[in-house]
Design a protein with these regions (language model features):
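Active-site metal-binding motif and surrounding structural segment of the metallo-beta-lactamase
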Residues: 44-45, 137-178
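Metallo-beta-lactamase
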Residues: 3-133, 138-140
Length: 178
């Protein structure tokens, strides 16, 4: 009877973890697979072959002499000195809405995020102002760099997303800009 109870508890834990994992992966920030016209357009791309995109040039995924497993282990558990600054990064917040539209300007927000204002058009590129990851302990911004929010943005003419990695496409920022 004790063995059966232990089995039920273990099975319950496994089922709970599985359900939690599936629910986690179905967050809107993970996006969804393309379908319909979008999928057909993707399939017509010259780099799309055999169900996936192929790089024109060979891309080396592991650039060290380590095995994949030891590389992952090292990435997760190795202590790297100087990886994060000890002090907040100095930053000056610009009043973006007050920049005259006639004035050409470039405001860099960090990493790949910037606002380009040229010829009376405003182009926002890769905005990440909320969270660059669906989990709070990954991709934390450096202290001092999180000074802008989507509410600080002026009216945008064009929104450019270079690719769909979390550090270039912040779901919550894009939803708030909408």
């Amino acid at each position: 009877c004790m063995r059966r109870m232990t089995l039920y508890i273990l099975l319950g834990i496994i089922i709970s973890i599985t359900i939690a994992g599936i629910a986690f992966l179905h967050q809107p920030s993970f996006g969804r697979l393309p379908k319909g016209e979008r999928l057909e357009r993707i399939k017509r791309s010259p780099n799309y072959r055999e169900g996936e995109f192929r790089n024109i040039d060979t891309t080396i995924l592991m650039t060290s002499h380590k095995s994949r497993l030891s590389g992952i282990w090292s990435f997760l558990f190795r202590k790297v000195e100087g990886l994060r600054p000890d002090e907040p990064i100095p930053a000056i917040k610009t009043a973006l809405r007050k920049i005259p539209l006639e004035e050409n300007a470039l405001v860099w927000f960090g990493h790949s995020s910037y606002l380009l204002q040229v010829d009376e058009k405003r182009i926002l590129v890769d905005p990440v102002f909320c969270m660059a990851s669906p989990v709070s302990f990954v991709n934390k911004p450096f202290r001092g760099t999180e000074i802008y929010s989507p509410d600080d943005m002026p009216d945008i003419d064009y929104l450019v997303i270079s690719h769909d990695h979390w550090d270039h496409l912040d779901y919550h920022t894009v939803k708030q800009l909408k």
